[in-house]
Amino acid sequence: MKTVTLATCNLNQWAMDFKGNLERIIESINIAKSKGAKYRLGPELEICGYGCEDHFLEQDTMLHCWQSLAVILKDPELTKDILVDVGMPVLHKDVRYNCRVILLNQKIYLIQPKKAMAMDGNYREGRWFTPWIKPRVVETFYLPRIISQITGQDECQIGDAIISTLDTAISSETCEELFTPNSPHIQMGLDGVEIFTNGSGSHHQLRKLDTRVDLIRSATSKSGGIYLYSNQQGCDGSRLYYDGSCMIMINGDCVSQGSQFSLVDIEVITATVDLEDVRSVRASFMARCAQANLTKEFPRVRCPIQLTHIDYCHPPDRVIHINYNTPAEEIGFGPACWLWDYLRRSGLSGYFLPLSGGADSAATAAIIGIMCQLVILDVSKGNKQVLKDAQRITNSPEDYIPTDSREFASRLFFTAYLGSKNSSKETRDRAMEIAKDIGSVHKEVDIDDISQSFNDAFSQITKKQPQFRAHGGTPRENLALQNVQARTRMVLSYHLASLLLWEQGRPGSLLVLGSANCDESLRGYMTKYDCSSADINPIGGMSKIDLRSFIEWAGKFRDMKSILSVLTATPTAELEPITENYTQSDEIDMGMTYEELSIFGKLRKVNRCGPVSMFERLVADWAHLEPSVVAEKVKRFFYYYAINRHKLTTLTPSYHAEGYSPDDNRYDHRQFLYNSKWDVQFETIDKIVLRLSQRPQLKNTVNCPNQASLTQQ
């Protein structure tokens, strides 16, 4: 038995926070050493933070990274008898690389650049970094003076190499490289690498952890090996939440797993594993042995350290079951942790939410409620950083210990029902009950006088008085009167956020929360610069369908029963007068259901469908509808998407949660001025509809894969 103890971690790094990032790195190294680990792995670009974006182009960023590394190397205890693997950008021959830097006993042994850049979805690493495309090549890297004065080294090696210790071989692949078809671990495993490490900067997306785990399991189950995975965790300054989930696997089995969602800044996990288990699996797999025999050798960098324990007092850790959260739990915990990080790092004193009594604002309020519950839980576990942040945010004395989530919410969460004569008693009462259930300080405000002042100003200018549709007005008048109410709410929300703490005699101001869902943004069913315009939006990347499942879960399992009432309510903007014969409905106004919108959104972004390919897909999936009806639905969606696309350019920064997000910032790049007629696209759809109408026999066979087998029976 040859056991080794290895450590990996989740770190809540913050882009460009060099002081805080360094403190967390140092603490993680100390924790790893205290647990007896001989190898410590950290997240991708952990010294500066993964989300620096165009700050990577600044030489200052490089300077501060080397300064931080110098602090680590200067302390003789930090790297004594432990391999420390840190992530940082490195400039080599005036080319910028995303690198792993391997330290031991105050020396740098290897700088290993990333070979494959993440360039899809939210990632654009190729904008800042160049991949190392020289397989099995190492070069001389000349160390900056700030480092050589400490290490006594003028140079070290940089490139595609393997670390050889006295008893095993180690190499790394970084984040995206795990997801590529020809991952580095394949060839390196065949060349004798037994321990693979992956310092990652992987953000949360619903159900993404399943993919990550499957890839790590596959990396070690096919031909044996030990795999360490590290990740950032938290909001590092943007729309993304890095969801941790550090883990250690051996031969396809998990032996240690960290949290996916947490308020803890530093989480270090370790596992003791037996190298002989890897060697036994590999040596008995003869097909693998034959391929290994043909593998071209990698350069090796020798490190004078023995990782294995010299006694029999360190038995291997047992296999554990991997913990997964349900999608509803992910919607609750991910944005809640993101909101806490955003609040504590913003320097502000709480959140303000316009609470309408509808599903979207109820879901947003519930996420704040869960955030408060997580704070209480962490404080009860002795998390000193969370307690310190809670006291500072709420301007509470040092002896204040939050023990009740509703009481804590009352110190930092403010809501208001911004009603009008078009609002119903049901939504007003519902908003009050939800606020009470969560614990917010709740206000009720009527906006009629404010909105009317705009209409009066218009009448004074034009000598005309616009009317609602219900009172004989034209569609233009009706829309303008709705929009002025919506925009009034936005201005009033910011005014309240600025002064509600002043009303209580407390310092600070509040962040304004938006609560527009992904579907409505995509359809453009919102007023530009209304309550959808806010500081941040925790639900802007989620569909109404996903939010409804979250509301059901939160109502049943997070002690928020009042929000369940929104599930049976008809979604309505309540911007038009309610009459005996008319009550405004979102789905009627939009001309499509939320279920349909969710499908359109996924096909448009995830499946990359234009109008024609979307119609071809749906005419099969919706075989119960006439092709002409499907065509009309698809055309209507793309028409409204085109005329409202400009609204997406001003969307409030939203938590990224799903692949169907319409986020205009860097995820869904498209023009914002369209020909809404879609002449060629719609003509092509019409031709397909005509062909289908001339072949009616196809109607009964579309989307019936089991029809042949049923006929045979």
From Swiss-Prot:
Alphabetical keyword list: ATP-binding, Ligase, NAD, Nucleotide-binding
Domain CN hydrolase: 4-275
Any GO MF annotation of the entry: glutaminase activity
Family per record: In the C-terminal section; belongs to the NAD synthetase family.
Source organism: Dictyostelium discoideum
Region (Ligase): 324-703
Pathway: Cofactor biosynthesis; NAD(+) biosynthesis; NAD(+) from deamido-NAD(+) (L-Gln route): step 1/1
GO biological process, one term: NAD biosynthetic process
Record protein name field: Glutamine-dependent NAD(+) synthetase
Enzyme Commission identifier(s): 6.3.5.1
